[in-house]
Design a protein with these regions (language model features):
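C-terminal extracytoplasmic interaction modules
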Residues: 3
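Active-site neighborhood of thiol-dependent amide/isopeptide-bond enzymes
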Residues: 6-70, 74, 90-91
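Active-site rim recognition segments
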Residues: 7, 11, 66-121
Length: 121
C-alpha cells in the first residue's frame, strides 16, 4: 500500500516550489507543491491506510550539490525512507536525515543550511 500511495502522490501533485507549512487537505485541493507538500500528503494518506508514517528533514544530493529536503519514513517492520518527490522507494543514500517530526520542525534545520560543510567521498 505504501508504494501505491507514493506512486499516486508522485503522479498527482505538480512539483512546484512553495513557501508554506502545508496541511494535507490544502495539498489535495491545490494539487501542487514541493517536498513539504508531498511529504505531508503522503503521510496523511499512509496513516489513513493504517501505515505509520513520519516526516524526516535533511538534505539531498542532486546535480552536484546538497539541497534542503523533506521526505517520509514508513513503518514496515522497520522504518523505511521513501521520497514521493523523487519517486524513490526506498529513498537512496543521497538523503541525509537531520531530524524527524512534523513539517513545522523544519525551522530547527534552517540555521544549519548554508553553514554545512559536507564532503562527498
Amino acid at each position: 500500500a505504501a508504494l501505491r500511495i507514493k506512486d499516486w502522490v508522485y503522479k498527482e501533485i505538480v512539483k512546484e516550489p512553495t513557501v508554506s507549512i502545508p496541511n494535507a487537505l490544502e495539498v489535495l485541493q491545490t494539487r501542487k507543491g514541493d517536498c513539504n507538500e508531498h511529504t505531508v500528503l503522503f503521510n496523511a494518506l499512509a496513516r489513513a491506510a493504517g501505515i505509520p508514517a513520519k516526516t524526516v528533514v535533511g538534505v539531498v544530493y542532486l546535480r552536484g550539490a546538497f539541497y534542503y529536503h523533506a521526505w517520509s519514513e514508513v513503518w514496515l517492520g522497520d522504518w523505511v525512507a521513501l521520497d514521493s518527490v523523487l519517486n524513490q522507494f526506498p529513498a537512496d543514500v543521497t538523503h541525509i536525515k537531520f531530524l524527524e517530526g512534523e513539517i513545522d520542525r523544519q525551522i530547527d534545520i534552517l540555521q544549519l543550511i548554508g553553514n554545512l560543510k559536507i564532503e562527498v567521498l
